[in-house]
Amino acid sequence: MTAHIISGTAVAKQVKANIAEQIQAYTAQDKRKPGLAVILVGMDPASQVYVNSKRKSCAEIGIESKSYDLPAETGEAELLAIIEQLNHDDSVDGILVQLPLPKQIDATKVTEAIVPHKDVDGFHPYNVGRLCQKIPTLRSCTPYGVMKLLESTGVNLAGLHAVVVGASNIVGRPMAMELLLAGCTVTITHSRTKDLAYHVSQADIVVAGVGKPNFVKGEWIKPGAIVIDVGINRVEGKLIGDVEYSAAEAKASFITPVPGGVGPMTVAMLMQNTLQAYQVHLQAV
């Protein structure tokens, strides 16, 4: 068996085309464009790449992107003051603060400072809590993107056993909640999980997000499983995932590549969240 490749690039293109169409319909009615404020603190090269990708997507689909590039020595109070100003700016529907932040800034405090209806990253405890209570509004972009990729396979997820490798706040935990919402039986594994290979071998769906290259071995994969690789690791100038790709591809029914899998979907779902926040904002005016 050789797995079908789930192209995040292709699915993201469809999502963004649909968003662009909806924005054009609003602007044709003399409505303003959606607005997204993107805040970058410092000059971390990876963060710059991610931020530029988000700004480029905004330009492509008709979202007004407002850039705030701040020096690495920016203080917490200064950043919080900018967020407070954006919270009250009616031309801004979404606020994104690129993580990680410099050590002098408390990321939790910053995340919680963004009003929940402008939290297009889906990190605010209010939005995470709504997902846990089965009433999601703005959803965490990477897990939301993974669900769109799973949807694109046409496989009915209800009743399948999903194993999430990694329990981070950004991927693992909200990912488990998304899969639970889709009717999966979910196992979350983490750094203290015993016999990880066994747990992975029982999975109909494996979602790997630990940030360790080739961490999930191909031999662990159950024949016919769906493998979603969230990891992006740079090794000897190449981008590789958390899953041992070639060996896993030989056993899986569907698999995402790295690059070109989950990455493009994270940005696409950020755009989707911004559109959603904009639509709510328009209804409230």
UniProtKB/Swiss-Prot annotation:
Pathway: One-carbon metabolism; tetrahydrofolate interconversion. NADP(+) binds at G166, A167, S168, S191, I232. It catalyses: (6R)-5,10-methylene-5,6,7,8-tetrahydrofolate + NADP(+) = (6R)-5,10-methenyltetrahydrofolate + NADPH; (6R)-5,10-methenyltetrahydrofolate + H2O = (6R)-10-formyltetrahydrofolate + H(+). GO terms for biological process: L-histidine biosynthetic process; methionine biosynthetic process; purine nucleotide biosynthetic process; tetrahydrofolate interconversion. Its EC number is 1.5.1.5, 3.5.4.9. GO terms for cellular component: cytosol. GO terms for molecular function: methenyltetrahydrofolate cyclohydrolase activity; methylenetetrahydrofolate dehydrogenase (NADP+) activity. It comes from the Bacteria. Keywords: Amino-acid biosynthesis, Histidine biosynthesis, Hydrolase, Methionine biosynthesis, Multifunctional enzyme, NADP, One-carbon metabolism, Oxidoreductase, Purine biosynthesis. Belongs to the tetrahydrofolate dehydrogenase/cyclohydrolase family. Catalyzes the oxidation of 5,10-methylenetetrahydrofolate to 5,10-methenyltetrahydrofolate and then the hydrolysis of 5,10-methenyltetrahydrofolate to 10-formyltetrahydrofolate. Homodimer. This is Bifunctional protein FolD. The lineage of its organism: Bacteria, Pseudomonadati, Pseudomonadota, Gammaproteobacteria, Pasteurellales.
